[in-house]
């Protein structure tokens, strides 16, 4: 029995996971716990949802156009659910835009702050084409294979702008 307990203690000792730097004293723990944090519920269900609703909930026609633009099925779509999801996404984006992180960036150690680099190289048109070629459409999200070619209508390039002269103007008044 005691041999089993020793194995259990030994096993637990070497399987512990750590995240970030360890705390060195109680003051660091108190300082860490005193920092203001966000709750996802506050962000998505707080006052910002009301702001997004005041800014304008997308109409059913706008939701249909967005679904068609994304090549999702429009006929069998749950428009009310899509509207609710759009309002949540808009409120989350608004919250991110309102948050100032400039003061915090000075003290951040990038090794513990982000998984992606902060400064990224600008993409060129050729880089975008390579990335697009590698994208696989997901049938689970309703994307039919080969439904939309994002660069197929761009026939001309001038001053880093891509000119589309056909296809998109069919249903305009």
Curated annotation (Swiss-Prot):
- GO annotation, biological process: glutaminyl-tRNAGln biosynthesis via transamidation; mitochondrial translation
InterPro entries xrefs = GatF (IPR027499)
Give the Gene Ontology MF terms in alphabetical order. ATP binding; glutaminyl-tRNA synthase (glutamine-hydrolyzing) activity
Q: What is its EC number?
A: 6.3.5.-
The Gene Ontology CC terms held by the record are:
glutamyl-tRNA(Gln) amidotransferase complex; mitochondrial inner membrane
Q: What class of enzyme is it?
A: ligase
Transit peptide as a keyword of this entry, yes or no, is yes
Any Pfam family = GatF
What are the subcellular locations of this protein?
Mitochondrion inner membrane
Q: Where is the transit peptide?
A: 1-15
Q: Which UniProt keywords apply?
A: ATP-binding, Ligase, Membrane, Mitochondrion, Mitochondrion inner membrane, Nucleotide-binding, Protein biosynthesis, Transit peptide
Q: What reaction is this protein's catalytic activity? A: L-glutamyl-tRNA(Gln) + L-glutamine + ATP + H2O = L-glutaminyl-tRNA(Gln) + L-glutamate + ADP + phosphate + H(+)
The membrane-topology field of this record reads: Peripheral membrane protein
Q: Does the keyword Protein biosynthesis apply?
A: yes
Under the heading HAMAP family, the entry gives: GatF (MF_03151)
Job of this protein:
Allows the formation of correctly charged Gln-tRNA(Gln) through the transamidation of misacylated Glu-tRNA(Gln) in the mitochondria. The reaction takes place in the presence of glutamine and ATP through an activated gamma-phospho-Glu-tRNA(Gln). Required for proper protein synthesis within the mitochondrion.
Q: What do we know about how this protein assembles, alone or with others?
A: Subunit of the heterotrimeric GatFAB amidotransferase (AdT) complex, composed of A, B and F subunits.
Q: What family does the database annotate?
A: Belongs to the GatF family.
Q: What is this protein called?
A: Glutamyl-tRNA(Gln) amidotransferase subunit F, mitochondrial
The organism encoding this protein is Candida glabrata (strain ATCC 2001 / BCRC 20586 / JCM 3761 / NBRC 0622 / NRRL Y-65 / CBS 138)
